[in-house]
């Protein structure tokens, strides 16, 4: 913000507002004192009132209560992957030893990136695209994360529909996945648990038969046996379609009025999982074999830390478990009050996220230990990753308990609430990001929200066909893998290097009254970008084509997957080229306008571009 100039008259002092007279909100005032001594006018000036963010003048909706924001962030970050993936990775990678790289990466990269996104959204008061007025040429990364969130919505809502289907099926005296005497069961169905199943198998293709729970999921719910592959999808299943419709209706009426409605919904969806997890833990630890399961979960093998795969798994889990890079944290924090303490919010929410992930392992492995003892197999034979854990192994364990139907209802209500608030966050990222960018959409938020949820519903129909699990697997593998890591990397570089850690720290001090310490500035400037670059490179080097059980995807499906992945990443260079070409002036002038914040426009006009100085790039 530049100081306004005023002519000096013969009066002893002149007060000149630094903003237009009609500007709303706190103003920066330049007080110019003029004295006359021996016929010479002497002037001195001071600034009253600190600089305020220009966005504070905007009439923007805010959260009804601070707790609404915290519950929304926690509800989004704590999702289904925290329940099934973290405990499995911990068991797979040396038990308690896995916590060493996980906590290390959480402290040096996860928390700083989380804090950065909260501060970025809160200061600029806009969605994932609008915040890039701090560096216009990188605005494409905002559209990248918006597109990724949209892609994720195409298949994530299907998981919630599965949970809803299971919930309805649980309101019976006898759960439908207990026996092999149902219409969907095959001759291979066996009540005995297959002890030699492969690590990636869901249970359907085992040599000696499959469990009733596995057949219920793949034959009773998905009807996968009626499809030969991704090129043989078949029609949408009406039961799953009906469940998907209910999910879309829930999402729409949770989002249509903005954070005023979604902030109330999360009081249920974000707290219910903790109530259910506590109940399941109390029940799980009383089961025979539960202690063996928990012991396997916590067993420490520090020699595993010598393996690169353990560190890679920890790094990727940190990136995905916190939810950075989806634009959700930016969108949520943009509705905060300008002076909100986003630093404290970042510490609290990331800590709760990590503790929830760790605690859920006790719930999961108490039941896995019970299942392993019941079927006399090693825990490794029942410990699975992915949907198979929560839709096959866990329902099978619950079916053997007294009052199994009641426990099943409780469990799938938990899955439903875990999924709903995470899906709400993804949709809010898309909606806020676009309505802040296009004022026409802002004036018709309700209609635009309806359009977005209907679009996700129509494309989700491919995932509820007979072969829908193949579409689901393809989207899950490509939509938010390397592309989301790439988006976060560009975001971190844009904030820390182009905009500058110094300026970003000034913004935070302006909001909270406290400047980030050297630790956070070093993480933003050096550690986090290097960490993200490492994870991106590793994700590319270790890439493996997707598969579902024994099914291998054809080449055209893998090519389609890469089109999906690159379409979001391409937003960065495409928008950068568009922005650069649309700016006037010479090459140097174009570059100056492209990388300098919009609020520094007057400085650019005068040729004072701090991004062209070595001091800017070296400053921490």
Swiss-Prot record:
GO terms for biological process: adenohypophysis development; amino acid transport; cognition; dopamine biosynthetic process; dopamine catabolic process; dopamine transport; dopamine uptake; dopamine uptake involved in synaptic transmission. PROSITE patterns: NA_NEUROTRAN_SYMP_1 (PS00610), NA_NEUROTRAN_SYMP_2 (PS00754), NA_NEUROTRAN_SYMP_3 (PS50267). Inhibited by cocaine, which occupies the same binding site as dopamine. Inhibited by zinc ions. Enhanced by the antibiotic valinomycin. Inhibited by benztropine. Inhibited by GBR 12909 dihydrochloride and amphetamine. Inhibited by mazindol, GBR 12783 dihydrochloride, nomifensine, diclofensine, amfonelic acid, Lu 19005, Win-35428, bupropion and ritalin. Residues 172-236, 288-306, 377-400, 543-553 are extracellular. Keywords: Cell membrane, Cell projection, Disease variant, Disulfide bond, Dystonia, Glycoprotein, Membrane, Metal-binding, Neurodegeneration, Neurotransmitter transport, Parkinsonism, Sodium, Symport, Transmembrane, Transmembrane helix, Transport. Chloride binds at residues 317, 321, 357. It catalyses: dopamine(out) + chloride(out) + Na(+)(out) = dopamine(in) + chloride(in) + Na(+)(in); dopamine(out) + chloride(out) + 2 Na(+)(out) = dopamine(in) + chloride(in) + 2 Na(+)(in); (R)-noradrenaline(out) + chloride(out) + Na(+)(out) = (R)-noradrenaline(in) + chloride(in) + Na(+)(in). Changing residue 368 to Q: In PKDYS1; loss of dopamine:sodium symporter activity. Mediates sodium- and chloride-dependent transport of dopamine. Also mediates sodium- and chloride-dependent transport of norepinephrine (also known as noradrenaline). Regulator of light-dependent retinal hyaloid vessel regression, downstream of OPN5 signaling. This is Sodium-dependent dopamine transporter. It comes from Homo sapiens. The lineage of its organism: Eukaryota, Metazoa, Chordata, Craniata, Vertebrata.
């Amino acid at each position: 913000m530049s100081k306004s100039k005023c002519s000096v008259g013969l009066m002893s002092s002149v007060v000149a507002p630094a903003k237009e007279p009609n500007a709303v909100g706190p103003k920066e005032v330049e007080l110019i004192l003029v004295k006359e001594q021996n016929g010479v006018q002497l002037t001195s000036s001071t600034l009253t009132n600190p600089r305020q963010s220009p966005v504070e003048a905007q009439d923007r909706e805010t959260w009804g209560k601070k707790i609404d924001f915290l519950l929304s962030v926690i509800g989004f970050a704590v999702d289904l992957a925290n329940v099934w993936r973290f405990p499995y990775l911990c068991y797979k990678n040396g038990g308690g030893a896995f916590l060493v790289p996980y906590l290390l990466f959480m402290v040096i990269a996860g928390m700083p990136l989380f804090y950065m996104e909260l501060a970025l959204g809160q200061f600029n008061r806009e969605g994932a695209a609008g915040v890039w007025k701090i560096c216009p040429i990188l605005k494409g990364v905002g559209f990248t994360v918006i597109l990724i969130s949209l892609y994720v919505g195409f298949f994530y809502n299907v998981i919630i529909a599965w949970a809803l289907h299971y919930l309805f099926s649980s309101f019976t005296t006898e759960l439908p996945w207990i026996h092999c005497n149902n219409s969907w069961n095959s001759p291979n169905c066996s009540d005995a648990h297959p002890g030699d199943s492969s690590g990636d198998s869901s249970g359907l293709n085992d040599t000696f038969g499959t469990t009733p729970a596995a057949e219920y999921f793949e034959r009773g719910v998905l009807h996968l046996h009626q499809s030969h592959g991704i090129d043989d999808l078949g029609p949408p299943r009406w039961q799953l379609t009906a469940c998907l419709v209910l999910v879309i209706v829930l999402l729409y009426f949770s989002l249509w009025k903005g954070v005023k409605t979604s902030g109330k919904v999360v009081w249920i969806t974000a707290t219910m999982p903790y109530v259910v997890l506590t109940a399941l833990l109390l029940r799980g630890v009383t089961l025979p074999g539960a202690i063996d399961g928990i012991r396997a979960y916590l067993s420490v093998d520090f020699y595993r830390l010598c393996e690169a795969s353990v560190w890679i798994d920890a790094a990727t889990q940190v990136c995905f478990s916190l939810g950075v890079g989806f634009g959700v944290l930016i969108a949520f924090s943009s509705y905060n009050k300008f002076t909100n303490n986003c630093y404290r919010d970042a510490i609290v929410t990331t800590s709760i996220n990590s503790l929830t992930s760790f605690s859920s392992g006790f719930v999961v492995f108490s039941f896995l230990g019970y299942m392993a003892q019941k079927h006399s197999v090693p825990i490794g034979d029942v410990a699975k990753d992915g949907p198979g854990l929560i839709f096959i192994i866990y329902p099978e364990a619950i079916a053997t308990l007294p009052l199994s139907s009641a426990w099943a209802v409780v469990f799938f209500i938990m899955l439903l609430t875990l999924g709903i608030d995470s899906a709400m966050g993804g949709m809010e990222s898309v909606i806020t990001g676009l309505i802040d960018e296009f004022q026409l959409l802002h004036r018709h938020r309700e209609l635009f929200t309806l359009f977005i949820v209907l679009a996700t519903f129509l494309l989700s129909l491919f995932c509820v066909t007979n072969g829908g699990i193949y579409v689901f697997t393809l989207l899950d593998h490509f939509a938010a893998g390397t592309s989301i890591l790439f988006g976060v990397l560009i975001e971190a570089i844009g904030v820390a290097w182009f905009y500058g850690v110094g300026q970003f720290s000034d913004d935070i001090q302006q909001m909270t009254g406290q400047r980030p310490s050297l630790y956070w500035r070093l993480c933003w400037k050096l550690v986090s970008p290097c960490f993200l670059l490492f994870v991106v490179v590793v994700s590319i080097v270790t890439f493996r084509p997707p598969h579902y059980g024994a099914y291998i995807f054809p080449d055209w499906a893998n090519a389609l997957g890469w089109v999906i992945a690159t379409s979001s990443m391409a937003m960065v260079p495409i928008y950068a080229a568009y922005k650069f070409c649309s700016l006037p002036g010479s090459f140097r002038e174009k570059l100056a306008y492209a990388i300098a914040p919009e609020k520094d426009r007057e400085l650019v006009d005068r040729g004072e571009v701090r991004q062209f100085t070595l001091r800017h790039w070296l400053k921490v």
